[in-house]
Design a protein with these regions (language model features):
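Structural recognition of an alpha-helix C-terminal capping motif at a helix-to-coil junction
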Residues: 16, 30-37, 52-64
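Short helix-capping/turn signature of helix-turn-helix
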Residues: 9-12, 21, 120-127
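Helix-turn-helix DNA-binding module
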Residues: 109, 113-117, 125-142
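A short, charge-rich alpha-helical start-of-domain segment used by transcription regulators
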Residues: 1-16
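Internal acidic/polar
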Residues: 76-104, 128
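Arg/Lys-rich amphipathic alpha helix in sigma70-family domain 2
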Residues: 44-45, 60-80
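DNA-recognition helix of helix-turn-helix
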Residues: 67, 115, 136-163
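Sigma70-family region 2
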Residues: 20-23, 36-51, 72-74
């Protein structure tokens, strides 16, 4: 009974989180089930702290398990160049509105594991580079570098798309 309710309420959100970290949909689907099973097993450790706290707790489990899954796959470390101060200007907000969300998601999924993970943790989940470094076992500088490279790659994809669209 509790399993069904947990699945109905949180499976879609957990799956979306897992897909952000894992480029493979099948892996994300498998991990979604593992996250929900772990949440059920560990529910006695959950401390209610107001509306949304269960969702936040389950999201944290999903993020941690996604990162651990990537670690097990042996994250390929990107050689540390100096911070890439790319010269590609940020796309205008009105131009960004024309880029389909599915396309952005596919570009993010196409990043290397390290770049995608750092991008998600920093840009979407709000972690600092110091926190990301601790979570992934890399230096703060490596986190900054991976984010810069991810952003550069995404900006290049966006620029090319906008150019192809005549914008």
């Amino acid at each position: 009974m509790a399993e069904e309710e947990l699945y109905k309420r949180y499976a879609a959100k957990v799956n979306a989180l897992c897909r952000r970290y894992l480029a493979d949909t099948d892996e994300a689907n498998d991990l979604t089930l593992e996250v929900l099973v772990r949440a059920l097993r560990k529910i006695s450790t959950f401390n209610y702290s107001g509306k949304g706290s269960l969702a936040a707790w389950i999201s944290r489990i999903a993020i941690n398990m996604s990162i651990n899954h990537l670690r097990r796959r042996r994250l390929q470390m990107v050689p540390l160049d100096f911070l890439s101060k790319d010269k590609i200007p940020e796309p205008a907000d009105e131009d960004m509105a024309t880029v389909p969300e599915e396309l952005l998601e596919s570009w993010i999924a196409g990043l290397t594991d390290l770049r995608r993970t750092v991008f998600n943790l920093y840009s979407l989940d709000g972690y600092s580079h110091q926190e990301i470094g601790r979570m992934l076992g890399i230096s703060e500088r490596a986190s900054i570098s991976a984010l810069a490279k991810a952003r550069k790659q995404l900006k290049e994809n966006i620029r090319q798309y906008l150019k192809d669209q005549g914008l």
